[in-house]
């Protein structure tokens, strides 16, 4: 018996079957489709129970072409960091850094380019740099120049927070870990 709910396929029956199983892309799925000795696809078997909030599922291979297979995951907890990917205009080096959301929205973020070793201001919510003319982050700085920033959801990044900003962020449940404590040490 198959029950379909929000794209998630679950199966009842044949639990604990010893038939050969082809897992393919279903390494963490609760439901796997079994092939018999002749290579024909059989009914689904439940290989193991998936605990936690992450799961993957697909429809049986014969119902949907490979390009249109259904994948689903439950929503994960929101990340407390951004992944910044940028190209330095001085040396044209492309690099990526991990920065905390709290520092980006409430503090100062400065990253160092691995190519030319220059420091680049990514966010200044504390008003430390007067030449930014009131702009607070890289999105506003580049928007003033007519350029766009693509948001995609660390390394060699300096993140500075006010004590109030870090404390309110942890009260809101947005924990930044070492970046927050490093930022608080810099302000001491």
Swiss-Prot record:
Zinc finger (DNL-type): 77-174
Lineage: superkingdom: Eukaryota
Molecular-function annotations in GO: protein-folding chaperone binding; zinc ion binding
Zinc as UniProt keyword: yes
Residues binding Zn(2+): 88, 91, 113, 116
Transit peptide: 1-68
Annotated keywords: Chaperone, Metal-binding, Mitochondrion, Transit peptide, Zinc, Zinc-finger
The name this protein goes by in its record: DNL-type zinc finger protein
Species, as recorded: Xenopus laevis
Gene this chain is encoded by: dnlz
């Amino acid at each position: 018996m198959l029950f379909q709910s929000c794209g998630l396929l679950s199966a009842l029956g044949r639990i604990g079957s010893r038939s050969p199983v082809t897992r393919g892309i279903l390494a963490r799925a609760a439901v796997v489709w079994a092939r018999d000795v002749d290579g024909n696809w059989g009914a689904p078997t439940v290989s193991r129970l998936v605990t936690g909030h992450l799961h993957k599922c697909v429809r049986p291979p014969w119902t949907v072409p490979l390009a249109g297979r259904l994948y689903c995951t439950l929503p994960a907890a929101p990340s407390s960091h951004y992944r910044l990917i940028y190209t330095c205009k001085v040396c044209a080096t492309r690099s990526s850094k991990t920065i905390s959301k709290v520092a980006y929205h409430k503090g100062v973020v400065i990253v160092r380019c691995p190519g030319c070793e220059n420091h680049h201001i990514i966010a200044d919510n504390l008003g430390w740099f007067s030449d930014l003319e009131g702009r607070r982050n890289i999105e506003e700085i580049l928007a003033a120049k007519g350029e766009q920033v693509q948001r995609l959801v660390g390394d060699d990044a300096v993140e500075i927070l006010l004590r109030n900003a870090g404390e309110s962020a942890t009260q809101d449940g947005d924990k930044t870990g070492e970046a927050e404590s490093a930022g608080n040490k810099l302000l001491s």
